[in-house]
Amino acid sequence: MSSGGLLLLLGLLTLWAELTPVSSQDRPKKPGLCPPRPQKPPCVRECKNDWRCPGEQKCCRYGCIYECRDPIFVK
């Protein structure tokens, strides 16, 4: 590949890295706390963050388990 082709490729890669979409990690977390887990099933990853859960549910971590749960609110 010629040096011009390499420079073009490098420029396109740089532009692509700058234009990647904003991740859900940049969003604020949903309100409330995760309720306690009543039992210990095998490791399951149902979600990665709150925004992968429907409605007001939160992505709750219990050890190696990630699941969508209704939040609890503590006064």
Swiss-Prot record:
Disulfide bond annotation, renumbered to this chain: C34-C60, C43-C64, C47-C59, C53-C68
Top-level taxon of origin: Eukaryota
Primary residence: secreted
GO molecular-function terms, A-Z: serine-type endopeptidase inhibitor activity
Chain ranges of the WAP domain: 27-72
Organism: Pseudechis porphyriacus (Red-bellied black snake)
Single GO BP term: antibacterial humoral response
Xref: Pfam families: WAP
Organ and tissue specificity: Expressed by the venom gland.
SUPFAM superfamilies, sorted: Elafin-like
GO cellular component, one term: extracellular space
Position of the signal peptide: 1-24
Keyword terms of this UniProt record: Antibiotic, Antimicrobial, Disulfide bond, Secreted, Signal
The keyword Disulfide bond appears for this protein: yes
Protein name: Porwaprin-c
UniProt record similarity statement: Belongs to the venom waprin family.
Localization terms from the record: Secreted
The keyword Transferase appears for this protein: no
Function: Damages membranes of susceptible bacteria. Has no hemolytic activity. Not toxic to mice. Does not inhibit the proteinases elastase and cathepsin G.
